[in-house]
Amino acid sequence: IEIESNKREVKKWYQPIIKGSKLAFAGFIIKEFNKTEHYLCRHILKPGSKSSTFTCTANTSNLDTYKYNIDLTISQKKIIHKYFMNRRSNILYNNILSDEGGRFFHSQIRYMACKLKKDENINLPKNYIWLSKNQIITLIDEQKIDIEARLLFGIVNFKGII
């Protein structure tokens, strides 16, 4: 589409609008250790990136077909099913937002956060780690947390600062 703006260095340009899947997913599992909330994060290397980053506990580009997605590990599929699709889970946040502010045509992401009970444990799959709030903030400063995880982390913690 053609874009015109008097608020940018370039006044006119053509912006590609990418059609993604209708509903993607990003979710955090949260658990308290030693009176401090920790977030279960996954260590990843995204295509085109020079260095690795951390992301949410679970992500998929299409929530409707996650069970059949060959790019998701069995562990990721089990996590989505057990903690985010289970009505008995302690869901702290569940909302649908436009993907990257509407840059992707009619594409949305369901963001969810689930808090484990104190006595509830999870077997950590390969590349997973529990990170505290302070560790995540430090990693955000170092640009080591991806956009979905930054957004969900901010949303989950926003109500605590107002």
Indicate where each model-derived feature is located.
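Generic structural hydrophobic/aromatic packing signal, biased to beta-strands
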Residues: 1, 39-41, 113-115
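Extended, Lys/Arg-enriched charged tracts that mediate electrostatic binding to polyanionic substrates
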Residues: 1-23, 27, 76-97
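Core of folded catalytic or high-affinity ligand/protein-binding domains
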Residues: 6-49, 56
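Sequence-level detector for tyrosine residue identity
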Residues: 14, 39, 66-68, 83, ...
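General "foldedness" signal
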Residues: 42, 51-55, 68, 150-154, ...
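Compact, glycine/acidic-enriched structural inserts
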Residues: 47-91
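Elongated scaffolding segments in large macromolecular assemblies
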Residues: 90-162
